[in-house]
Amino acid sequence: MTTIRLKENEPFEVALRRFKRTIEKNGLLPELRAREFYEKPTAERKRKRDAAVKRNYKRLRSQMLPKKLY
């Protein structure tokens, strides 16, 4: 569980921003969203496979040489 301690005379908005930052670093929010609803094992495998294909395609696109513009 993520906790933060309030410092003396710290505004609530600043404490809330610190809390959000720690949640982001821990990766808690995406995990909660993923666990919100049950996902079939086949759907999970398909989603992960599609994400891997997309990552691979993106990596290949960044390695390709640009076309000559002349």
Swiss-Prot record:
Domain of life of the native organism: Bacteria
GO function term, MF aspect, one: structural constituent of ribosome
Record's keyword terms, sorted: Ribonucleoprotein, Ribosomal protein
Keyword Coiled coil attached: no
Gene Ontology, cellular component aspect: ribonucleoprotein complex; ribosome
Gene3D superfamilies, per database record: Ribosomal protein S8
GO BP terms in the entry: translation
Protein family membership: Belongs to the bacterial ribosomal protein bS21 family.
Protein name as annotated: Small ribosomal subunit protein bS21B
